[in-house]
Amino acid sequence: MLLQKINSPKDLKRLSIDELKTLSAEIREIIINTVENNGGHLASNLGTVELTLALHYVFDTPEDKIIWDVGHQAYTHKLVTGRAKDFHTLRQFGGISGYIAPWESEYDHFAVGHAGTSLSAALGFAKARDLKGEKYKVIAVIGDGALTSGMALEALNQIGYLNTDLIVVLNDNEHSISPNVGAIALYLAKLRKHPLYRFFKQTTQNLLKNSSIGKGLLAFDLKLERSLKSLLLENPMFEYWGFKYFGPFDGHDIPVLISVFKGIKDNLSCPVLIHITTKKGIGHKDAEATPSKFHSIGAKIEREKKVPTYTEVFGKALVELGEKYPEIVAITAAMPEGTGLSYFAQRFPERFFDVGIAEEHAVTFAAGLAKNGLKPVVAIYSTFLQRAFDQIIHDVCLQKLPIVFVLDRAGIVSDDGPTHQGIFDLSYLRLIPNMVISAPKDESELRDLLYTAINYPGPFAIRYPKSKGVGIGLKDHFERIEIGKSEILKYGKNVLILAIGSMVYPALEAESILKTEGISPTIVNVRFLKPLDVLTLEELISSHDVIITVEENVITGGLFGAISELVNILKLNKKVLPISLPDKFIEQGNAQLLRDIYGLSGHKIAEKIISVLEDVKV
């Protein structure tokens, strides 16, 4: 295999064009086999193989800096930068990351996992280079989906204004996770589909591939191309932003990519945007046909009995409620399938809004809808809702607007690593006035909390994990839950275990283990982090000797903080002991393995409590 000879990008430069094409096929096979075993991002990585090889072939990395957006399309980059031998550990505990990781390689310049960051970071690299008097190229690689984010557009504005030597490669595959939406997507489609421009592109690409092209010929070709674009397009958007724009080019045509990159590298030292078009999932029949389904896939596991995920339960419950409440509208940021809102979108397309990768806009857009009498449900992954923190405070909670925030992927999120762990939401939401914060113990309670939230006249957050439910039966109706009311699941003595959300069932498992040791704890489903069930908790805390909080959240600011503050305010003279995630970023790994490591599984909770009781001699 050719890949066995590639220890660094310098080895790529010795290959012929035909060998690069052969290497592309090898890399696709390795990516498919690895992702089918380990899980990971399949379609996006299959679409960027040739692009990645051409970038490393032309530019002198790591001296020249390639700054990737999101990073979930960089598997080829990892394979040709010395990590091929470890690629089988992709996304595994202790293995290589599925994203760009500077602690892993000198070729990974900027840690990433969220969309829209590459242009700002690349501009920072470029300006630092200029101020230090250094000479190298900075190349930002961003997808058309990420380009819709406000942060990316802010950076484009600044890059053009500063007239900085910076190359932006726009990888246009018409998708982020789901098909792209919005005016920018329509603009790029106009570029791709204009018949005269497509004829011109085919002609020039044949010239680029089949001729011995000198700098002068390439410069002429690029100039002619830009002139033709001005005739075809009324508003050459990127030119107005101060970029020299070239493309679209076929992102799977290695000779064309190499020629274009070389010409621009050698001739231009200003903001340049190179527009390439790629096919997401190319090389895998199913991923190519339905790239959204193969954006990210799970590892191979044994088939279990059919238990719906929390995502599925939420999505279907919202459709049921949508039938009853015509004021319900649903909003997501480029993830209708991932959040379960695809069910609602199919049933009520006119009441569904996918705003693209624009979480800040999503929240304030929802605020406007709520202000005018509608009931927005905003479904966003926990880790991505962080991006709209100011909007939640300023535009929603300050005005007490009736918006339901549905935080999918809360808690530990298996193999995607620190950028995707949903372990901060209890903390960052709890400090905001007027916000109700809840977490269901199971899928049935999720349905009832959603129903409760729809009928609540203010901001209401529901968080739940990326997992199947616990397997209990679902009622055929909804029941409203009293706001702030906890649930006592087991009555015991001496030891009080206060658990929330995904930690309630592990706490019950721990209770069964503790019983065999002669320990009979009281188990409480806290359910609402805010407001707390003060009366019930005061009575329970006062009547127990050992108070334990259990949460799948960092220790700072979540359930432990809330109960500790309550104990202090009520002057209860009790010590609260936390079982939570530590004050650190949590690495990648199987979710259950990580819960074991950090003491959040049932048997680990029991072990911790036994240890505590030995220390306090209860």
Curated annotation (Swiss-Prot):
Q: Where is it found, in Gene Ontology cellular component terms?
A: cytosol
UniProt cross-references to SUPFAM superfamilies, sorted A to Z? Thiamin diphosphate-binding fold (THDP-binding), TK C-terminal domain-like
Q: Looking at the record's lineage, which domain of life comes first?
A: Bacteria
Q: Which GO terms describe its biological process?
A: 1-deoxy-D-xylulose 5-phosphate biosynthetic process; isopentenyl diphosphate biosynthetic process, methylerythritol 4-phosphate pathway; terpenoid biosynthetic process; thiamine biosynthetic process
Show the GO MF annotations: 1-deoxy-D-xylulose-5-phosphate synthase activity; magnesium ion binding; thiamine pyrophosphate binding
The family database entries (Gene3D superfamilies) matched by this protein are listed as: 3.40.50.920, 3.40.50.970
The protein depicted here goes by the name: 1-deoxy-D-xylulose-5-phosphate synthase
The alphabetized UniProt keywords are: Isoprene biosynthesis, Magnesium, Metal-binding, Thiamine biosynthesis, Thiamine pyrophosphate, Transferase
Please name the HAMAP family in this protein's record: DXP_synth
Q: Which family does it belong to?
A: Belongs to the transketolase family. DXPS subfamily.
Instruction: Name its co-factor(s).
Output: Mg(2+); thiamine diphosphate
For the ligand (thiamine diphosphate), the binding residues are: H72, G113, H114, A115, G145, A146, N173, H284, E359
What SMART domains does the database record attribute to this sequence? Transket_pyr
Q: Where does Mg(2+) bind?
A: D144, N173
Reactions catalysed: D-glyceraldehyde 3-phosphate + pyruvate + H(+) = 1-deoxy-D-xylulose 5-phosphate + CO2
The record's EC number reads 2.2.1.7
Mind telling me which Pfam families this protein's record contains? Answer: DXP_synthase_N (PF13292), Transket_pyr (PF02779), Transketolase_C (PF02780)
Please share the entry's free-text remark on the cofactor.
Binds 1 Mg(2+) ion per subunit. Binds 1 thiamine pyrophosphate per subunit.
EC class of this enzyme? transferase
* Native source species: Dictyoglomus thermophilum (strain ATCC 35947 / DSM 3960 / H-6-12)
Q: Which CDD domains match?
A: TPP_DXS (cd02007), TPP_PYR_DXS_TK_like (cd07033)
| Annotated function | Catalyzes the acyloin condensation reaction between C atoms 2 and 3 of pyruvate and glyceraldehyde 3-phosphate to yield 1-deoxy-D-xylulose-5-phosphate (DXP).
Q: Which residues form a coiled coil?
A: none
Q: How does it assemble?
A: Homodimer.
What pathway does the UniProt record associate with this protein? Answer: Metabolic intermediate biosynthesis; 1-deoxy-D-xylulose 5-phosphate biosynthesis; 1-deoxy-D-xylulose 5-phosphate from D-glyceraldehyde 3-phosphate and pyruvate: step 1/1
